[in-house]
Structures are given as structure tokens and as C-alpha cells.
Amino acid sequence: MEVNILAFIATALFILIPTAFLLIIYVKTVSQND
């Protein structure tokens, strides 16, 4: 089974970018609540 590196990178970025964005918002919200 051939692994498409570009497809893998695109998928990783598509998942990681929104996750990192939400994580930053979550951390800021928790910090404000304190």
C-alpha cells in the first residue's frame, strides 16, 4: 500500500490547525476564569 506523503501532510495540517486553534481558545478561557 503506497503512502501519499502530500496527502498525509495535508490531512495532518487539516486536523492539527483547527485543534491547535481550539486548544488556544480553551486555554485562554480557562485563564480568564481563574
Swiss-Prot record:
Coiled coil: none annotated. Its main location: plastid. Pfam families: PsbM (PF05151). The keyword Chloroplast applies. It is a single-pass membrane protein. Signal peptide: none annotated. One of its GO terms (biological process) is photosynthesis, light reaction. SUPFAM superfamilies: Photosystem II reaction center protein M, PsbM. Keywords: Chloroplast, Membrane, Photosynthesis, Photosystem II, Plastid, Reaction center, Thylakoid, Transmembrane, Transmembrane helix. It is found in: Plastid, Chloroplast thylakoid membrane. GO terms for cellular component: chloroplast thylakoid membrane; photosystem II. InterPro entries: PSII_PsbM, PSII_PsbM_sf. The chain crosses the membrane at residues 5-25. Disulfide bonds: none annotated. The keyword Methyltransferase does not apply. NCBIfam families: PS_II_psbM. Belongs to the PsbM family. One of the components of the core complex of photosystem II (PSII). PSII is a light-driven water:plastoquinone oxidoreductase that uses light energy to abstract electrons from H(2)O, generating O(2) and a proton gradient subsequently used for ATP formation. It consists of a core antenna complex that captures photons, and an electron transfer chain that converts photonic excitation into a charge separation. This subunit is found at the monomer-monomer interface. PSII is composed of 1 copy each of membrane proteins PsbA, PsbB, PsbC, PsbD, PsbE, PsbF, PsbH, PsbI, PsbJ, PsbK, PsbL, PsbM, PsbT, PsbX, PsbY, PsbZ, Psb30/Ycf12, at least 3 peripheral proteins of the oxygen-evolving complex and a large number of cofactors. It forms dimeric complexes. This is Photosystem II reaction center protein M. It comes from Aethionema cordifolium (Lebanon stonecress).
